[in-house]
UniProtKB/Swiss-Prot annotation:
Topology with respect to the bilayer: Multi-pass membrane protein
Compartments in which it is found: Cell inner membrane
Record-given protein name: Probable protein kinase UbiB
Keywords in alphabetical order: ATP-binding, Cell inner membrane, Cell membrane, Kinase, Membrane, Nucleotide-binding, Transferase, Transmembrane, Transmembrane helix, Ubiquinone biosynthesis
Sequence positions that bind ATP: L131, A132, S133, A134, S135, V136, A137, Q138, V139, K153
Species per Swiss-Prot/TrEMBL record: Pseudomonas fluorescens (strain SBW25)
Length: 534
């Protein structure tokens, strides 16, 4: 093992001892042979200083001591309220990703290496002192030679080896927890670390962030709701991002917003509208909408516009997920818990063999108390969190896109009620969802979907043969995973479309019309059944 990795291990051990995290570990229901280990740990042989801190505070302080990679892991973990006890999740939300800036000469050297030009050849002004600094990157203000005011985001040098070492230790801890603790297995710690690994490496690629920002800007081009700064692609590289500099009021600066007479009710409602527009219209949403990434334009405070930055983390939903999510929300607010349970099974989010009655009862037990509150006080994010927590007890598959969505909704909801405490999220969102559902079922949309499915008709014979071969295999008894179930559903709808079109063509005339209309009727009926079946 490399010396650096060994030193890192000793550092982790010292922090564990300092904040008595071993006490938290041995409080878990571990096997006897692991619990026996506490008697051979030298630092447990002597009295230790008592810490007048909650377990969540001790964990938070330990992560802060371990540095930026562990801090960011704790921040991401804090969004998994479906996995964590509430007291720990609340403490982890307090983690601040603030670290001292790295040397500006290093920053300028890296920019020149990435751009292949001297700073003075690209920028007429470059501020050596950074505007902001975080664990992954820091930002400098500058002006392009062409006159545009910009910000230059630069990845910290030497991050990858540090991230690799810290991730290796996180995976070791996660695998040990999964192996030796039944409670830990329910939390899927290895999956959580794997999600973090993908997120942190994605954040190291600034071209990905630039592409996300360009997509979001295009989706809201000309919109009064949201403005996204311009990306200057000529000067973007994997470790350098150049964007338009924006000037606005941070969304949590309530005093300044009040001074400029901002319509706070409209601002809060527009935040909700932006969220649902991203999720249901665009299926592409900014998944890191914490207050540090959101500003409010100083123009037209009576019709306020949001400004979003830092598009490193985004999410998207499939059309099936969009549909099931909307139906779940409607069913929940109607207290139709059987429908909620059935939708979870139909979507493949929980296993097909789940007992519907038991699942319905569990959802009712957890969610019914929520309706003791007035409708305007009900939290959408809490609704989703409770549903996911309940579904996890029934072996719900981890859905990364839904976890991102729940995190984003909690952020938007908390922010909206901070701006306007009487915000009624359901009444604000309901018209949008109802309009989206109507548009989804409109003849124009149905015909558009039918047209896209018809494009697959040339492949129908091969797909039919493949499906029959799969069904004839002895191992075909194994339950299909959710993604495969959706593909098979899509194939059956395509087959239904082919029957429907074939039946119509047969009915209006063709080489077989001497047989009468009954074959056409059968084909149309089969087609309709296959298309609308659940």
């Amino acid at each position: 093992m490399k010396l650096l990795a060994v030193r890192r291990l000793f550092r982790i051990q010292r922090v564990v001892i300092r904040y008595r995290l071993d006490d938290l570990l041995f409080a878990l229901p571990l096997p006897w042979f692991l619990l026996a280990v506490r008697y051979v740990l030298p630092w447990r042989w002597f009295p230790r200083k008592q810490l007048e801190l909650s377990r969540g505070a001790r964990l938070r302080l330990a992560l802060q001591d371990l540095g930026p990679i562990f801090i960011k892991f704790g921040q991401i973990l804090s969004t998994r309220r479906d996995l964590l006890p509430e007291d720990i999740a609340d403490e982890l939300m307090l983690l601040q990703d603030r670290v001292p800036p790295f040397d500006s000469q290093q920053s300028m050297k890296l920019i020149e290496e990435q751009l292949g030009k001297k700073i003075s050849e690209v920028f007429s002004r470059f501020d050596v002192d950074p505007l902001a600094s975080a664990s992954v990157a820091q930002v400098h203000a500058a002006q392009l030679k062409t006159g545009e005011e910009v910000v230059v985001k630069v990845i910290r040098p030497g991050l990858k080896p540090i991230i690799g070492q810290d991730l290796a230790w996180l995976f070791i801890l996660a695998r040990a927890a999964e192996r030796f603790s039944a409670d830990a297995r329910l939390l899927h710690p290895v999956d959580v670390v794997a999600d973090y690994e993908k997120t942190i490496y994605d954040e190291l690629d600034l071209l990905r962030e630039a592409a996300n920002a360009s997509q979001l800007k295009r989706n809201f081009e000309g919109s009064p709701l949201l403005y996204v700064p311009q990306v200057y692609w000529d000067w973007c590289r994997p470790k350098v991002l150049v964007m338009e500099r924006i000037y606005g009021v941070q969304v949590t600066d309530l005093a300044t917003l009040a001074d400029q007479r901002t319509d706070m009710k409209m601002l809060a409602e527009r935040g909700v509208e932006i969220f649902f527009t991203q999720v249901f219209r665009d299926s592409f949403f900014h998944a890191d909408m914490h207050p540090g990434n959101i500003f409010v334009s100083t123009v037209n405070p009576w019709s306020p516009q949001y400004i979003a930055i830092d598009c490193g983390i985004v999410g998207s939903l499939t059309p099936e997920d969009q549909d099931y999510l909307a139906r779940n929300l409607f069913a929940f607010f109607k207290r139709d818990y059987r429908r909620v349970a059935q939708l979870h099974i139909d979507s493949g989010w929980v296993p097909a063999e789940t007992k519907l009655n038991e699942f319905e009862a569990a959802i009712r037990t957890v969610c019914e108390p929520i309706f003791e509150k007035p409708l305007k006080d009900i939290s959408f994010g809490q609704v989703l969190m409770r549903l996911f927590q309940t579904a996890r007890r029934f072996n719900m598959e981890v859905q990364p896109q839904l976890v991102l969505l729940q995190k984003t909704l909690l952020n938007i909801e908390g922010l909206g009620r901070q701006l306007y405490p009487d915000l009624d999220l359901w009444n604000t969102a309901q018209p949008f969802l109802e309009r989206w559902m109507r548009e989804r079922m409109s003849p124009k949309t149905v015909l558009g979907n039918l047209h896209s499915q018809m494009e697959q008709l040339p492949h129908l014979a091969n797909m039919t043969r493949d499906l029959l071969e799969r069904m004839s295999q002895p191992h075909a008894k194994d339950p299909a995973p959710p993604w495969k179930k959706r593909k098979d559903d899509w194939f059956l709808r395509l087959l239904g479309a082919a029957h429907l079109v074939g039946g119509v063509m047969l009915a209006i005339g063709g080489p077989l019309n001497q047989l009468g209309h009954w074959p056409a009727g059968i084909m149309v009926a089969v087609g309709v059944y296959l298309i609308v079946r659940r």
